[in-house]
UniProtKB/Swiss-Prot annotation:
Topological relation to the membrane, as annotated: Peripheral membrane protein
Protein name: Voltage-gated potassium channel subunit beta-1
Keywords recorded for this protein, A-Z: Cell membrane, Cytoplasm, Ion transport, Membrane, NADP, Oxidoreductase, Potassium, Potassium transport, Transport
Species annotation: Gallus gallus
Catalytic activity, as annotated: a primary alcohol + NADP(+) = an aldehyde + NADPH + H(+); a secondary alcohol + NADP(+) = a ketone + NADPH + H(+)
Source lineage: Eukaryota, Metazoa, Chordata, Craniata, Vertebrata
Places the protein is found: Cytoplasm; Membrane; Cell membrane
Role summary: Regulatory subunit of the voltage-gated potassium (Kv) channels composed of pore-forming and potassium-conducting alpha subunits and of regulatory beta subunits. The beta-1/KCNAB1 cytoplasmic subunit mediates closure of delayed rectifier potassium channels by physically obstructing the pore via its N-terminal domain and increases the speed of channel closure for other family members. Promotes the inactivation of KCNA1, KCNA2, KCNA4, KCNA5 and KCNA6 alpha subunit-containing channels.
Positions contributing to NADP(+) binding: 90-91, 97, 119, 192, 222-223, 248, 277-282, 288, 298, 357, 359, 363, 366-367
Residues annotated as catalytic: Y124 (proton donor/acceptor)
PANTHER family in the record: HYPERKINETIC, ISOFORM M (PTHR43150), VOLTAGE-GATED POTASSIUM CHANNEL SUBUNIT BETA-1 (PTHR43150:SF7)
Domain remark text: The N-terminal domain of the beta subunit mediates closure of delayed rectifier potassium channels by physically obstructing the pore.
Gene this protein is translated from: KCNAB1
Amino acid sequence: MQVSIACTEHNLKSRNGEERLISKQNAAAPNVVNAARAKFRTVAIIARSLGTFTPQHHISLKESTAKQTGMKYRNLGKSGLRVSCLGLGTWVTFGGQISDEVAEQLMTIAYESGVNLFDTAEVYAAGKAEVILGNILKKKGWRRSSLVITTKLYWGGKAETERGLSRKHIIEGLRASLQRLQLEYVDVVFANRPDNNTPMEEIVRAMTHVINQGMAMYWGTSRWSAMEIMEAYSVARQFNLIPPVCEQAEYHLFQREKVEVQLPELYHKIGVGAMTWSPLACGIISGKYGNGVPESSRAALKCYQWLKEKIISEEGRKQQTKLKDLSPIAERLGCTLPQLAVAWCLRNEGVSSVLLGSSNPEQLIENLGAIQVLPKMTSHIVNEIDNILGNKPYSKKDYRS
């Protein structure tokens, strides 16, 4: 900001003589004309100062980097909300896999590393994840204006009226989430599933209502199809309502189609960005399943039988083989395989933020280190990874070209 002002002042000084000359020439002109010319000169001066300032100092309006932490910040879709490109999620961990003390350690490490995005949902640990997150925020006393807190609505309770995306549940569910979080508002409220039982207009009107009431700043979608997101946008435009700004989508080395083909088209057409989750594919990419399923792992839990079956399947074994082939690339870049996988997600310019899920401080610190790997993700490295994976999706435009 100081540099910008200095540049503006410099241009103003250089034009002092010209302005005096113009003022003398127009002394007899009507006041309206003088005011119009003065306004034009002011706009021209500002435009000129901005024009010289931007290329000289290489300002990026899309991405900025914190000097102290090295964390990068991007716009959430085409909204003005700036989010850290790495966020901390609370699924499985908060209120379940880890203690409250470890949860506080993780949030502290994340915040001190420049993370400003913390994501949760009403369904996580039956609301306990929101309670723990809220308790930690209150204890730490971090400035609310420095944080981006997001939550998701759909599965609220056992009653029919306590789930879905009806106007009733969106309003009551968000109010309950705010009570658990001990917050006046969340920055983004997500519709955690599409709801075929509720008209799209009702959903969009309810989301617009909670934003207008100050309960949320923005709203987004999670696990919605491109067609459903487009319908929500169309309804918002038709009735002068607020459209979604972001879609939460699963994205990792083995799940690419939606984020790399479908969402970019939505971003360019209607400004919807991508906040991605599970960059390590529920731990599959961490490397701990290379020789089977350890008893202490998530896949060994009864409620994660589906994950165990996925790992020991034929496709799962093929994925482990590909991960072993990727290891030399990670070694060459001086990073771990998880860091390579997270950096690979971040190299996608259409991704606003990648949500990390960690069960211990060491794991979180390792994953946050992906920021240092990001500059090394050259087109050559990305192509090398694509050749090993063999699953790069192609859009209709790619086929036509």
